[in-house]
Amino acid sequence: MKQIFNKLKWTGKKAYFWYVSRGGAGGEEVASTDDVVEVGSEGLVIRVGSQERYIPYHRIVEIRLESGEVLLNRRK
C-alpha cells in the first residue's frame, strides 16, 4: 500500500481513501491525498484541521482516484 501512496504523491494524482475510525460515522472516515503529510513504512500521517493523525495501512479499506477508478477495495 505504501507503493500506491508514493505513486500518487509523485504523479500528483488526487485520490480519496476511506479508513476505519472509532470516531467516524459508520465507523469510517474519508481523507484525500491532499491531507497526507507523510508516507511511512507502516502507515500515513494526515492533517486533520490543525492536528496530525497516524493511520496504519491495515485500517485503510478503500482508495479511489478522483476520476472514480478504484485502486483498492478491502471492504467485506
From Swiss-Prot:
The organism's place on the tree of life at top rank: Archaea
HAMAP family: UPF0248
Similarity-based family: Belongs to the UPF0248 family.
Protein name: UPF0248 protein PAE2518
